[in-house]
From Swiss-Prot:
Reaction(s) this enzyme catalyzes, per UniProt: L-glutamate 5-semialdehyde + phosphate + NADP(+) = L-glutamyl 5-phosphate + NADPH + H(+)
UniProt GO BP: L-proline biosynthetic process
PANTHER family documented for this protein: DELTA-1-PYRROLINE-5-CARBOXYLATE SYNTHASE, GLUTAMATE SEMIALDEHYDE DEHYDROGENASE
Family named by the database record: Belongs to the gamma-glutamyl phosphate reductase family.
Native source organism of the sequence: Phocaeicola vulgatus (strain ATCC 8482 / DSM 1447 / JCM 5826 / CCUG 4940 / NBRC 14291 / NCTC 11154)
Enzyme class: oxidoreductase
Name of the gene encoding the protein in the UniProt record: proA
Record protein name field: Gamma-glutamyl phosphate reductase
Amino acid sequence: MEQIKDIFKQVRQAKGSLAFCKEEIINDTLYALADRVEAATDRILEENAKDLAAMDPSNPKYDRLKLTAERIHAIAQGIRQVATLPSPSGRILSEAVRPNGMKLTKVSVPFGVIGIIYEARPNVTLDVFALCFKSGNACILKGGSDADFSNRILVEIIRNTLLDVAHLSPYLVALLPAGHDSADALLHARGYVDLIIPRGGKGLIDYVRQNATIPVIETGAGVCHVYFDKEGDVAKGAAIIRNAKTRRVSVCNALDCLIIDVNRLTDLSTLCSGLQQDNVEIYADDLCYNYLKTSYPSHLLKHASTDTFGTEFLDYKMAVTATMTIQAAVAHISIYGSGHSECIVTENDRAADYFMKMVDAACVYVNVPTSFTDGGEFGLGAEIGISTQKLHARGPMGLEELNTYKWIIQGDGQIRQ
């Protein structure tokens, strides 16, 4: 435990060096990091293969754990995009002069040290560092033991780049040892860590929220819905449903439940037809089951149970239910949704407006799949996570969400009466 505490102290000490680091140096470091990551593709894949060998390929985490040359290139491009974005730190948010001549300035500043606890997602290691570094924060990483080989090689590349290019302390990033003890230490590192952000499934997020003694921003699980309205376009709907469900089933913005207006049940087979090609299992309520049983493969069609709705599948599985009205659809989402991403397919402006106003989620879509809930797609570069809470940050969290603010008060000897 003392060894972990020493890491906390060193990171806390190192973060002060960023306050005087020019943005040009930060950007040069990020560009160099992207180049070095791509140059080390073969080494990274070798280490990643060790992690993959220990995991069952049928595990939903397997796809998130797996790195490829294409994915490494995409991660590097994300780092480069972060380098092109303006730093939020030091930005003047407001200014005022009080009647006594005292000047008040509200300035954005980094949190300081951010702790990230995440599962088998080695891409998070690089994404988090890039965003923390650009926004003026140091970071302490607690990755899942499933990705330990991958994370260690990536942190090694980051630290060497910090030393070689920026001549900064390698303790601007630290990777904690595998195991629950280091995770618990991080959750209780009050005085060393300013903020904890968990990235993973519901179990991890609940554990962090219930045990942390320092502030937490939840990047919650995604139970995402598409509601096909009575005035929805079938071609758009079929494309949106398939993209939202099958583009990457293991991510939090993937579709979990299709809600269809009862007046459009005759179109249900067409809306779901593309899912057959990806062997998506459908768990349908009784009404929808009867409309699908003559067209959807019997081995892929199942009756919904009481546990079906509200489940984040992270797999080639999807729930289907029908509602009488848009109000009933919104009510269903309010009960079973997680506040992540929700979509309506409709050509009716009034229906779209109602859905946008009444659905309580971080991201609400009209005729666009939930798969777009992503920092890169929102123009934020990489993302540190997708917040499903309402305080401080909501939705994809980029650079701006990694800053808070402080007040600068300047005067000439004024005293309060």
